[in-house]
Amino acid sequence: MVTATGIAPGSEMTAQMEQVEERNVSGVLHIASIFASHMVLQRNKPIAVFGALAADCAGMEVVAEIHDFDGSLIAQEHAYSSQNVVNGFSQWRVMLPAQPEGGPYTLRIVAGNDAIEFDDVLIGEVWLAGGQSNMELELRNSEHADQALEDCADPLLRFYNVPKTGVINRNAENTSSWQESSPENSGVMSSVAYYFARKLRSELDSDLPVGIVDCYIGGTSISCWMSEDALNSSDAGRDYLTRYQRAIAGKTQQQFELETSEWESQVDEWNANVAAAREADSDIAQEKLNEQFGACPWPPPLTPTSQWRPCGPFHAMLERIMPYSLAGFLWYQGEEDEQYCGFYRELLGMMIGEWRALWSESLPFLIVQLPQWIDKKVDEGDGDPMLWPVLREAQWDAAQSIDNVFAICTMDCGEYNNI
């Protein structure tokens, strides 16, 4: 079913591609894809384990257990799946008792005659890193990347990349995994989140595992990470929904596909030109590239399945991993909302409240403020230099007015004309 903001929550309309083997399925038992061998679970608070059962098993008991390396039982709890069946599944959630840091352990989930086990499970600190391209910048593309990757091997630092999508993509979820930090793996990790995790590893106990859940998409507005109910609760949120609905009104599926295909071709051509230019001159400036090839084609066309539409990633990414037990959130986003910066303070507060409600606790929320940066069009007098200061003020105000929210100033970290 398609709603005003795209695919309806829980809809069976999912990303279409060649099917791959289901990773977290055994008979009637389904477990959320964020659970995998090598994962890090949150210490010192109840551990949420969740998934679904086939419809004819509604009300069945589900048991979750943590076992030590020698097979001895460390923790066990059970729950019953919901009697309500949605899209052929009955949801369940088991809350294991809080555990101190440690591992490696085995997490075992049983429903009737079906069971799934995950090995090499650690318990430590787990943070979710969210936002747009600021957070998405991969370690391999960051400054001093070669040295960082050479030094990144750490079996107690692990990460999980939530598949980037605007519509539930089970194939991508089935191929996703928790990975140890290593030169082979960590290049695709968020650079900001990696250095944050490294700091935790160095400042906290030396044997404390740290896990990062990467959940971001470049170019996303804050509205992409909120629900329809949240956006509809304020004039600011409704404004985003109205603009999106106007953008897709009257268009057919064929038009959506054509617009997307044309845009993807333009981006592919631009990327190829830029790659060739950088191959010829590794020091070529972005300004020179823009003069030769124009700016990267942006924004992408909006469609009912777009990952840049309001609420899309909220349903297809964030809801797919909640309420995986966390220590807190790390948020780095804002520039996509510069034209509507007057709304940002209200929406940021609403988003923080909604995320905390999903996790049922007032988790710490660390907001990375936008850095110093001046767009060339502003430098040339064709833009408003005060948009980003408004966003920074909104981020700072949220930290001053909402409990357990903190702003991280990066004014001295940006470059004059390159964010």
PLM-predicted stretches and their roles:
Residues 2-419:
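Cell-envelope and extracellular/periplasmic
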